[in-house]
Every structure is written in C-alpha cells, then in structure tokens.
Amino acid sequence: MKLYNLKKKQDQVNFSKAVKLGLGKNQGLFFPKELPILTKEQLYKLLKMDFLTRSSKILSMFIGDEIHYSELTKRIKNAFSFTTPKIVSISKNIACFELFHGPTLAFKDFGARFMAQILSFLNHDKNDTITILTATSGDTGAAVAHAFFKMKNVRVIILYPKGKISELQEKLFCTLGENIITIAVNGSFDECQKLVKQAFNDDQLRIETGLNSANSINISRLLAQICYYFEAFALLTKKQQKNLVISVPCGNFGNLTAGLLAKALGLPIKSFIASTNSNDTVPRFLKTGFWKPNNTVSTISNAMDISQPNNWPRVEELFKRKFWSLKTLKYGSVSDILTKKSLKKLAFLGYVSEPHAAVAYYTLKNKLKQNEFGLFLGTAHPAKFKKTIEKILQITLFLPSKLRNQIKLPLLSHNIRPDFSKLKKFLLEK
C-alpha cells in the first residue's frame, strides 16, 4: 500500500512508514494512493462474515502483503477483543449504532487498539523507544492510554485542555502512571493540537524521542474505523439498507472520514450528515464556501469542541478523488440548548444517551426524509458524562465497573501553559 502526503504529493510512503511517522513533511496527512473498490459479489460475501473476519479482509485490502494475513488477523483479534457494536432501535426509521462497548467506553477504542497492535508488531524486534504524543478533547486520551499501557519501549504523552473534559474522562487516563504521562494544558483543545503539530515539525524532537501520533491523523486509526461501518450495514434489514443515512458527531472529522472511505469502497450508504456542536467551522464552510474558524467555545459535547478539524483535508481529497460534490454532504450544527432538548426527546423515547450522540440525533431527525432510514452514532457511554446527564434528565446513572474502579484514583497530570518551548523541554527531559 502506498500513501501520499496531502501537502507534498511526491512524498510517498508505505503503510508501515506512514504508521511510524504519523504525519508527513510540512505536517501533511497521509492518504491512500489507491482505493480498492468492491464488486457486488465481494460486498455480499463480506457482509455475510463475522465482524473480526470481515475486518481482517477489509484492512488487508489496504495493507496488502506488508503484514502477513495470518499476523494481521491475530492483531485484529487482539485489538477488537470486546463486545461488537450494537444497533438499538429508537423509532420507526431511526436507530443508534452504539460504538462504546470497548475497554474505555468510547468508539476511539477501535482505532487506538488497532494502532497499538500494529506498532507493537512493527517494533517487536527493535529496542528503539517510541514516544506517542497525542492531544485529546475527551475520549482519545483514555483509548490511547489503555491501548498502550505497559507496552514495551513505548511512552505515551497525552495533552488535554485543563478543566474542559469531564471528570470521568480525565480519571480514565490520568490515573494510570507507568508509561502513560498526562499533561493538562491551560488552554483549548485547538491549542493542544497546535502544540502536537509544532512538536512534529521539530526535527530534534522527532529524532531524539522517536515521535509518533495516536490522533486520528495516524492512518492506522483511521482505517480501523472503516470496519464498523460495514458492521452497521450488515446488522440492518434489506429495507433499512436501501436508503441509509448516517449522522456522525464530528470533532476532528476522523469518524466521518472513515465512513466516507467505507462508501468509497462500495458500501452503499446513501448519504452522511456531518453533525457538529456550536464549533461549526465545517457547516459554515459548506454553507458559504469560506473557511473561517472561530475561537473554540466550550459545550456539553466537549469532545467536539474543535474549530480546526485535522481530518478535513482528507474529506476534501476523497471527494475530489471520487468526483463527488461537497454539496452532497449534509451538515448541521447544534447548540447546547438544542442538545439538551435532544437528550430529553431520546429519554422520552426510552433511550438514555449522551451529548455527542444527541447532537447527531438532532440533525438526523431534522434532515431525514420519509423514505430513508437513519442511523446516528453513539460514540461514548452516557456514564462518562454522569453529572451532565443526571442534571439534564433528573435521573441517577449507575457507573459501569470500568469507571467505578478508577474514579477514586488520584490524578497524576503535569500542568503547562500552551507554550511549545515548555513542552519541548518537558519531552526532552522526561
């Protein structure tokens, strides 16, 4: 598999190199040079397979012979060793696709655990230490931390905006210690992402620390997420499959990119909805044609509090490659007031959700046509937002054992200002 740098297309690497580098020159994202296309017969066979077998087939289409199929299958089995995604009916023509049944109760478990398995394989006969540097607006931190926890020759540094993620999200990854180092940045998530990008642009840091990223900018995480879109389609009836619309809660737009890649492979999804909160750079761009990121605002759907989404260049590249018009991509932005109304509506229908899924549900409900079937993605367990949900819905949420075990542990985070010189010093000395 060859991938090219979106900022310098002559900069081409194989899959293994792309995973190890994370980003190309000039902070460019890697994108597949060739996109496989499934025949109707191949698609039919894939949809009949179980989740793990199908995932192995899909990922081998991209990775090819760089990793032997038997080894890839083993790594996928290790990565996806948890309850498969579920579809829960909400109303006659709407359902939620729950992706939060993994170790850290969020969809990020799929990509983070697959990336950890791939890096472990690529580094198994080497003694070089890899430094995973990543920024999180909520769920990525926990997924990455647990995926790489105690992994040999890997240290993980996670930046997050201080006071701007939920207490339970913070407890899931800032209490581990060992090879997991967490840094609370006195700033926004966009400032955390900027620090990560500056680090990747620093040759000294990259060489001396073996720098890599576990954000959705890493191609291994992105490709892993394609797999659950096929699972969603396979779980539906033929009638539901016919005019399928999927609403994706969007922050960094990696989840949407993966869904669009699944469509590009031949999965017959009618359309996608890019659903954001008040940080609506993309909806405004799709409406006006002008890319004007505003200052990031804090919302109750905090994992989407991102004004400059990293993966948007990949979305644009895919639309160009497939000759799709961006006008066909539906979109919507949802305020906190409407998010709360959406949560209450879902609760009235008998489904307790959380803010990110509620955003996706709101846009889906308002854009779905009579002859269409809609899925919205449930990206995190409601208990991760316990205080918010209990306050809005006036209910008591019980914590899953995974959260109960960590809520009592002390935070081990360091604190810094959003100053790259401070981060660089920390990385070189730690």
UniProtKB/Swiss-Prot annotation:
Biological or metabolic pathway of the protein: Amino-acid biosynthesis; L-threonine biosynthesis; L-threonine from L-aspartate: step 5/5
Gene Ontology terms for molecular function: pyridoxal phosphate binding; threonine synthase activity
Listed EC numbers: 4.2.3.1
Cofactor requirement: pyridoxal 5'-phosphate
Keywords associated with the record: Amino-acid biosynthesis, Lyase, Pyridoxal phosphate, Threonine biosynthesis
Top-rank EC class of the record's enzyme: lyase
UniProt-listed GO biological process terms: threonine biosynthetic process
PROSITE patterns noted in UniProt: DEHYDRATASE_SER_THR
Residues annotated with N6-(pyridoxal phosphate)lysine modification: K108
Alphabetical list of Pfam families matching this protein: PALP, Thr_synth_N
Catalytic activity: O-phospho-L-homoserine + H2O = L-threonine + phosphate
InterPro entries in the cross-refs: Ser/Thr_deHydtase_PyrdxlP-BS, Thr_synth_N, Thr_synth_N_sf, Thr_synthase-like, Threonine_Synthase, TrpB-like_PALP, TrpB-like_PALP_sf
SUPFAM superfamilies: Tryptophan synthase beta subunit-like PLP-dependent enzymes
General function of this protein: Catalyzes the gamma-elimination of phosphate from L-phosphohomoserine and the beta-addition of water to produce L-threonine.
PANTHER family in UniProt: THREONINE SYNTHASE FAMILY MEMBER, THREONINE SYNTHASE-LIKE 2
Family, per entry: Belongs to the threonine synthase family.
Protein name: Threonine synthase
Native organism: Buchnera aphidicola subsp. Baizongia pistaciae (strain Bp)
Gene name of the record: thrC
